[in-house]
């Protein structure tokens, strides 16, 4: 997702963001960023009547015009890779008429609304999840590792590391190989895919967790049948690039929900369901609020979120398309990790 803020948001968060979705994932994010009452501006084809056009019987040519639609409903349609925004035209030709914007990847829009902290956090996540040129793939097998940077035109090899006794071998043990590869990965700021057959990749991730846990947190394992560049091609072909941001987010969501159920089992500092969470917020005990995305637009929960943010609580929205989100739905769609028991 590309995002541009033409002017600073007002104190209450109201303002306009220019947005360019680049993938089906971005369209999914937009479906949660566009709510009823928001105004969405886009260029679309409309029949524009001139003063004498209505007297003509021939078919008029459609022209590109910029219109604003006050949203009544936003619907994500993954089957056709598009987002539909239904509403009434509030700016441009045919004001007052109903219109549907069909938004696809590469289609620039502007969204005018009051942006809450959870909206800005989702927008930041969508922008940062762009994988072009930032994902690195390490193809590991027994005795060798190759590191690739994913460019828009394809994988670019950075280095090849080998273990052995021959002249081409630079390292004398698996541990030395792991250490050298980790040294290269210290310079990487984005997500890292560890690909290859067998269990060497799992061993490397375990090694990284002990030596550099902050780097290991950004790693994603991809099983492949091939080695080297073939492993990179196979991982990309299996859709690893589109899964990177989701899987890293999923890991965080899994961790949060595991903690919720752990505290429930221990009768610990946790609340779930609207009533309990509202009480926790009122007492100032809520540290982290977890909300299922399908509940965010619920009026009661929306007010709870605003109250929690005013008190400095961290608000995390979980996708109901993933297992942690469905577990949260089973608890009433909202839960809170507390600073202390109430």
Curated annotation (Swiss-Prot):
Any one GO molecular-function label of the UniProt entry: metal ion binding
Signal sequence segment: none
Sorted UniProt keywords: Cytoplasm, Endonuclease, Hydrolase, Metal-binding, Nuclease
EC assignment: 3.1.-.-
GO CC entries: cytoplasm
Classification via SMART domains: eRF1_1
PANTHER family for the chain: PELOTA (PTHR10853), PROTEIN PELOTA HOMOLOG (PTHR10853:SF0)
Subunit: Monomer.
Protein name in the entry: Protein pelota homolog
Name of the gene this protein is made from: pelA
